[in-house]
Amino acid sequence: MDLKQQYILALDEGTSSCRTIVFDKDLNQVAIAQNEFNQFFPKSGWVEQDPLEIWSVQLATMQSAKNKAQIKSNNIAAVGITNQRETIVLWNKENGLPVYNAIVWQDQRTASLCDKLNQDTKIKEFVKKHTGLPINPYFSATKIAWILENVPLAQKMLKEDKLLAGTIDTWLIWKLTGGKMHVTDVSNASRTLLFDITTMTWSQELGDIFKVPLSILPKVMPSNAHFGDIVPSHWSTSATGMVPIRGVAGDQQAALFGQLCVEPAMVKNTYGTGCFMLMNIGNELKYSQHNLLTTVAWQLENQKPVYALEGSVFVAGAALKWLRDSLKVMYSAAESDFYAKLAQKEEQEVVFVPAFTGLGAPYWDASARGAIFGIEANTKREHLVKATLEAIAFQANDLIKAMASDLNSSIKKIKADGGACNSNYLMQFQADIANLEVIIPKNVETTTMGAAFLAGLAVNYWKDTKQLEKLTGIAKQFKSQMNQTVREKKSKRWNEAVKRTLKWASLD
């Protein structure tokens, strides 16, 4: 092992696990360590995590990855951090102890407060204009307000000026730097409902609306700023290296950067349990006419912020899981391509709308429910599997169309990542139905790579994104092979099917 050699470490703190990956100059993964942590569900719709457990698990993976790579802290050029967004921690700055569990992004306990605020059209429009977001329990502000109102210890610490608040990146940086730095980056700040994306600062008006004192919030920095140095003893008892934290971004924004969607109109879609699609819209703030979110993608030092439009599909890979676990149609999701190809032999127009929990963008109908259309006497399991894969692509296509319309131009290609990318049938159908090119990178760890890229570029470990483009490479490309008549016919059928599922749960 060359002791002069330098590496980049990326910490990836997800919703259910923490990972650390060590990258070298050629973007090889030298070592990886991952551990899960606990989720708590104290009441229906409540989701919590233990901030001290998150910290100890993340620290353990950081040490483990370094040891597996057989390197010293002196060999680490910089560290990047990416994290689950919106999840919030409040803690005592004197002893580093949280005053309550972390309230997770999925947590719905503040739904009634959000409903109440949304009844005031002026407030609703002000918040949308200044944050790019709707007032929703998903985002951080009402979670902080809930803790301040319901946890006596939080009120006591606030009165004594000992209280700090932050998203998970802020909590980890505070711990890593030995309590020296209380900071966040623009991408994480933009998910709190307290950060004004028109001025790129915390907003007193937003603080007043949500009853959150700005004094407890971290300093907001560009995504590749110097967020402080890691205390050497966090690596090992004998470590001496002062390793800088030089890249921070929320997970979806990190994936957009990791996919090198650095020019306007570049789109990435993560095909996971659901789909997260983000489009780079450049330095000009734009608001969606289709209820997509406007968010800060990132900001590099001495440059203007880059904004993004974000849309999500609630059920993507989860629909394949439903086929496997609830209907027992197949043993594993890996079989889906086999069945889809089998179904192509006898053409049946089965359409499945997997609206298990309503439909997200661009429909925004919480009372839509799932339905399967076009079933005949000879419909078999393979037709259902094929329809499920196609449903994932149809839903993503609805987002693509919404984004193209907001941008006023067509989208020529999307970069894909996530588990469901393994389905060649899905990726080909996506290219066909959206009439564009789908590109899958060689390294699908795009979220972690985004954090690594930000940190590495900040310390000149890599020269620029052009160099990174050469290093990332393309694993697969899918181009449209469907003629326009067939595409229109299939799209028309999908649109009709969706229409028939809307408002289902609200029927008397």
UniProtKB/Swiss-Prot annotation:
Pfam families: FGGY_C (PF02782), FGGY_N (PF00370)
Top EC class, one word: transferase
Residue numbers binding ADP: 15, 19, 273, 317, 419
Keyword ATP-binding: yes
Entry binding sites for ATP: 15-17, 273, 317, 419
A GO BP annotation: glycerol-3-phosphate metabolic process
A GO CC term attached to the entry: cytosol
Regulation: Inhibited by fructose 1,6-bisphosphate (FBP).
Residues involved in sn-glycerol 3-phosphate binding: 15, 85-86, 138, 251
Catalytic activity, as annotated: glycerol + ATP = sn-glycerol 3-phosphate + ADP + H(+)
Gene Ontology molecular function terms on file: ATP binding; glycerol kinase activity
EC number assigned by the record: 2.7.1.30
Assigned keywords, A-Z: ATP-binding, Glycerol metabolism, Kinase, Nucleotide-binding, Transferase
Annotated metabolic or biological route of this protein: Polyol metabolism; glycerol degradation via glycerol kinase pathway; sn-glycerol 3-phosphate from glycerol: step 1/1
Residues given in the record as glycerol binding sites: 85-86, 138, 251-252
Family assignment from sequence similarity: Belongs to the FGGY kinase family.
Function (record text): Key enzyme in the regulation of glycerol uptake and metabolism. Catalyzes the phosphorylation of glycerol to yield sn-glycerol 3-phosphate.
Classification via HAMAP family: Glycerol_kin
Record protein name field: Glycerol kinase
Classification lineage: Bacteria, Bacillati, Mycoplasmatota, Mycoplasmoidales, Mycoplasmoidaceae
